[in-house]
């Protein structure tokens, strides 16, 4: 609230520890005692924020376009959106990229007058199975990360996956710690 965030509330740190209710130790997992718990990726920062303004610069658009052109299998992930106004442009972006839209129930993408032909609502089943043939090499996420644990696990398991996060509220909600561009 004091920082001027449009969503008032307590401060929250998204630090991915092990599943807190699971009594099973996960080998090689990051723990509170691990020196790597808050580290980035080697000499690189964990995330790179290209633009801290509510508009997109031409340099940022060129960077995103270059990454989209280089990708073979793109997936658009639609997290929580406050307004239905983004549904139409988001569906056009996905159609232009030939990408499915993984739609969180609060994404405003499941209903409305926009093109919903590429909207996937039952993505938990796909994410649980983790089929190699459907694994994306680029994810473009709009809004918050969906609440689906299988989706987060699947995206986290894809080591070479490139993720771009478009977050107009600047919440930087990235629980998978895998997005390279915000």
Can you say where each PLM-predicted feature lies in the sequence?
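Glycine-rich, anion-gripping cofactor-binding loops and their flanking helix/strand elements
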Residues: 60, 78-168, 172-175
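Short, intrinsically disordered, charge-balanced linker/junction segments flanking boundaries
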Residues: 1, 180-182
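Short secondary-structure junctions and interdomain/linker hinges
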Residues: 3-7, 71-75, 100-104, 108
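Active-site donor-nucleotide binding/catalytic segment of nucleotide-sugar enzymes
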Residues: 65-84
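Conserved acidic residues
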Residues: 72-74, 137-138, 180
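Conformationally flexible catalytic loops at phosphate/diphosphate-handling active centers
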Residues: 2-69
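Hydrophobic residues at beta-strand termini and immediately following loops
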Residues: 13, 166, 182
